[in-house]
A protein has these predicted regions:
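Short glycine/threonine/proline-enriched tight-turn/helix- or strand-capping micro-motif at secondary-structure
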Residues: 26-32
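Structured binding elements
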Residues: 67
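Jelly-roll (double-stranded beta-helix
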Residues: 1-25, 37-42, 51-63, 73, ...
Length: 186
């Protein structure tokens, strides 16, 4: 039993504030429920990004991910599948499924759930700083310019494994790479 599973779970209400938001890879990330809040059951967070803020191809070794799009749209690459996901639509990504996405709109906002909890611990470890505003940071370092070894090392601690170029070619055959799509689709 983990330390979080031993904590009492109590009802709560939360909204987006500077106190529960961070700048993460040139994006805004707001934590609504984390492991310590849910007895290790799940995480819920909101992510606001723009083209160029996408994560490298990766897998979540410890849990499932469910995303609900609040604004904009993406092309999600999950194994050999490609899903165009827009506002009002959702996407489920099972544990250990190789995945990433490309943002197809000027801004992209999603609510995501991970089960069991733990992914937000990785995101906190990678966060550049507390949010200074409840919008995209004016400046920041996206994954493409980040210290990738640090991301790999932190990911290992929290069950996030980044794929090698060879694994990407084999496991995400339709993924075009980190270039932005030619035709944004709001």
């Amino acid at each position: 039993m983990t330390q979080e599973q031993k904590l009492p779970v109590v009802a709560f209400k939360r909204r987006q504030t500077l106190e529960n938001s961070v700048f993460y890879m040139n994006s805004l990330l707001t934590f609504y429920a984390e492991s310590k809040d849910t007895g290790g059951g799940f995480d819920v967070a909101e992510w606001l990004g723009k083209p160029g803020n996408e994560p490298p191809p990766h897998v979540h070794e410890h849990g499932h991910e469910f995303c609900y799009v609040l604004e904009g749209g993406i092309d999600a690459y999950v194994g050999s599948d490609v899903f165009r996901v827009a506002k009002g639509e959702c996407l489920f990504i099972p544990q250990n499924a190789p995945h990433t996405f490309l943002i197809r709109s000027p801004r992209y906002r999603m609510l995501f759930f991970t089960q069991p909890a733990g992914l937000t611990k990785y995101m906190r470890a990678m966060a550049a700083e507390p949010a200074l505003q409840l919008d995209l940071p004016k400046e920041g370092i996206p994954y493409s310019a980040a210290d990738i070894q640090h991301a790999i090392d932190e990911g290992r601690k929290y069950g996030v494994r980044f794929l090698s170029p060879e694994e990407v070619k084999e496991q995400l055959p339709s993924y075009p790479g980190m270039a932005s799509p030619e035709e944004p689709n709001p």
